[in-house]
Regions:
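Acidic, metal-binding active-site segment of PIN/NYN-like and related structure-specific nucleases
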Residues: 103-119
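Short secondary-structure boundary segments
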Residues: 39, 85-87, 110-112
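Hydrophobic residues within well-ordered alpha-helices
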Residues: 72-75, 93-101
Length: 140
């Protein structure tokens, strides 16, 4: 391992980081939340861009970069939200047990479960409260 970091998430079990159990944050307000996305170009200038911008204007902090590392940071409790678009199922399927095993929740932008036929929109949140607040912005 180049970075000597390893997340292990197994459905039905907790998530470990380098052998230690981890948990997502208990952040319950958008104004306090740290939001990550890989790159602004994921969100087109149309509907996706407007939805993301509306959300980004209501969170405490927005950062770009990190790719899958952002989901690991979410599982560790250092990031509260990861919102992305234009993903393929192989981009997110391995991340779901890592996030959910640490207490987080994942869905598409409509709140539906992710799978092979998902449309490429992903939301990962530290908890259900944050997820519901985000969906109020993305489901308009």
């Amino acid at each position: 391992m180049a970075t000597h970091t390893r997340w292990v998430g197994v459905k039905g079990h907790g998530t470990d980081f380098n052998g230690k159990s981890i948990k997502t944050s208990d952040c319950g307000q958008l104004a306090d939340a740290a939001l990550y996305a890989t790159h602004p170009s994921m969100f087109d200038q149309g509907v996706d861009g407007k939805k993301f911008d509306g959300l980004a204007n209501n969170v405490g902090q927005v950062r770009f970069g990190g790719d899958c590392y952002a989901y690991g940071l979410l599982a560790l409790g250092h990031v509260d939200l990861v919102v992305e678009a234009k993903l393929q199922f192989y981009d997110f399927m391995a991340l779901i047990p890592v996030v959910e095993g640490a207490g987080g929740v994942t869905s598409d932008w409509q709140g539906d479960r992710l799978g092979r036929t998902s449309d490429g929109h992903m939301l990962a949140a530290a908890n259900e409260t944050l997820r519901d607040l985000v969906l109020n912005h993305l489901c308009v």
